[in-house]
C-alpha cells in the first residue's frame, strides 16, 4: 500500500466525508443480505438450470470471493490512478452490475454481474478505508469506525425487510435495492 501522507499536508474531512466513508463499509453487507430472502425465489425461477440449488447460493457469495482475490491489488491501483477517480468509477460499476439482473434473465449473466459487484466492492472498501486513515486523526477514526459498526446492523435489517418485500413482487425484485 501507499505510504502515509505528510501530516502537515494531509487533507481534512468533516462529517459529510465521514458519513460517506461509513456507508461504504455497508456495501459488502448489502451484496449478501439483499439477496438472502430471494434465494428460494431465484432457485424456483431458474429451476430448469442444472445444479441451480448450488449455483444460486454461489452467486450470492461470489462478490466475497472477488473481494478476497482483488482486494490486495486495489491499494496499488488507487495509488496509480488516484483514489477519487477510482472510487467514483468503482461506485458506478457497483450500481451498473448491481442492477444488471433487472435487465438480464440468464443465471450466467447474473452470476457475472455479481462478480462485477465484488470487484467494485473490493475497490470501494479499500479506498474508503484508506481515505479514513488519510483524512481523520486517531480519535476521529475511532469515532467513524464506531459509526460503521452501528449503522451496518441497522441498515441490514432495513435491507432484509425491503428485499423480502421486493422479491415478493417479482423474482428479481431484490436487485432493485442496488
Regions found by a protein language model. Give the residues of each.
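Extracytoplasmic
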Residues: 16-50, 74
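Hydrophobic alpha-helical transmembrane and interfacial-helix anchor sites in secondary transporters
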Residues: 42, 77, 165-166
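Residue-level signature of the transmembrane alpha-helical cores
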Residues: 24, 87-93, 97, 113, ...
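Residue-level signature of mid-helix packing/kink "hotspots" within the transmembrane helices
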Residues: 33, 63-72, 122, 156-157
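Conserved MFS/SLC helix-loop-helix module at the cytosolic interface between two early adjacent transmembrane helices
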Residues: 68-108
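Extracellular/periplasmic helix-loop-helix junction of adjacent transmembrane segments
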Residues: 38-68
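Cytoplasmic helix-loop-helix junction between adjacent transmembrane helices
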Residues: 107, 113-152
Amino acid at each position: 500500500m501507499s505510504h502515509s501522507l505528510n501530516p502537515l499536508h494531509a487533507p481534512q474531512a468533516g462529517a459529510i466525508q465521514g458519513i460517506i466513508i461509513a456507508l461504504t463499509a455497508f456495501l459488502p453487507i448489502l451484496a449478501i443480505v439483499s439477496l438472502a430472502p430471494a434465494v428460494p425465489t431465484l432457485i424456483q425461477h431458474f429451476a430448469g438450470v442444472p445444479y441451480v440449488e448450488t449455483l444460486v447460493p454461489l452467486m450470492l457469495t461470489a462478490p466475497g470471493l472477488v473481494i478476497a482475490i482483488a482486494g490486495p491489488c486495489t491499494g496499488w491501483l488507487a495509488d496509480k490512478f488516484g483514489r477519487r477517480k477510482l472510487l467514483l468509477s468503482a461506485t458506478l460499476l457497483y450500481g451498473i452490475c448491481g442492477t444488471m439482473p433487472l435487465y438480464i434473465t440468464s443465471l450466467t449473466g447474473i452470476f457475472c454481474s455479481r462478480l462485477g459487484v465484488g470487484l467494485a466492492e473490493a475497490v470501494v472498501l479499500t479506498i474508503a478505508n484508506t481515505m479514513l486513515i488519510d483524512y481523520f486523526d486517531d480519535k476521529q477514526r475511532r469515532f467513524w469506525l464506531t459509526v460503521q459498526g452501528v449503522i451496518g446492523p441497522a441498515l441490514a435489517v432495513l435491507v432484509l425487510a425491503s428485499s423480502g418485500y421486493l422479491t415478493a413482487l417479482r423474482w428479481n425484485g431484490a436487485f432493485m435495492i442496488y
